[in-house]
């Protein structure tokens, strides 16, 4: 039941979900591309001679992961804010808060999985470009090549799952514990234009 209703809700709120999906996809792509750069055998071979390169790649990867956690958290809060009125309506017609929460989690699971998979694909192409940029900086002869890094993918999956899972748990807690009137009031605050 959740999955069918979740897909219908995604179709109905397609404009908002496209923004959300693109944001998550780009976040996953950036995380993967920087991690793939760090796991690249060519870059690792260059890094043996240049400790500063290793430090730079690690710092950039950490910065991208740190910024990604804020972007993912904001994206989830954005979607929750856009949907609070709808969730309040569901509860007013008799749906339990637990069911509403599970519906939101199902919708976000579909979107998050799709965004991660597409982000991994986009990130693979982007990692080839980043690899080329690094080789240009250090004047190393090269050709553009795209290669998939299973290690980078696994670490990206772990980071993405932790950040996305934490954000979804926070959103689920809000849905479960807020009263209907609070959901409606928050929706009014969220959608009303500021003076």
Go through the PLM ranges and name each one.
Residues 1-69:
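Membrane transport/envelope proteins' first extracytoplasmic loop
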Residues 28-40, 74-78, 110-139, 151-177:
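Small-residue-rich transmembrane alpha-helices
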Residues 49-62, 66, 138-166:
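Conserved transmembrane alpha-helices of multi-pass membrane proteins
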Residues 66-67, 76-81:
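Short helix-coil transition sites and intra-membrane helix breaks within transmembrane domains
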Residues 87:
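Conserved phosphate/oxyanion-binding catalytic-loop motifs
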Residues 178-189:
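Juxtamembrane inter-helical linkers in multi-pass membrane proteins
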Residues 190-195:
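Conserved small/polar residues in nucleotide/adenosyl-binding loops
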């Amino acid at each position: 039941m959740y999955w069918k209703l979740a897909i219908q809700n995604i179709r109905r709120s397609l404009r908002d979900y496209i923004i959300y999906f693109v944001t998550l996809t780009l976040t996953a792509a950036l995380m993967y591309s920087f991690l793939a750069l760090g796991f690249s055998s060519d870059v690792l071979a260059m890094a043996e001679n240049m400790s500063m390169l290793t430090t730079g790649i690690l710092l950039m990867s950490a910065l991208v992961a740190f910024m990604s956690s804020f972007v993912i958290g904001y994206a989830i809060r954005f979607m929750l804010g856009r949907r609070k009125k709808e969730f309040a309506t569901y509860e007013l017609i008799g749906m339990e808060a637990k069911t509403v929460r599970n519906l939101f989690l199902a919708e976000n699971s579909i979107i998050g999985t799709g965004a991660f998979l597409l982000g991994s694909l986009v990130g693979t192409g982007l990692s080839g470009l980043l690899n080329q940029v690094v080789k240009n900086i250090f004047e190393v002869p090269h050709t553009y090549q795209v290669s998939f890094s299973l290690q980078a993918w696994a670490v990206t999956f772990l980071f993405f799952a932790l950040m996305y899972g934490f954000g979804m748990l926070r959103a689920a807690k809000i849905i479960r514990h807020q009263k209907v009137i609070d959901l409606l009031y928050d929706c009014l605050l969220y959608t009303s234009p500021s003076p």
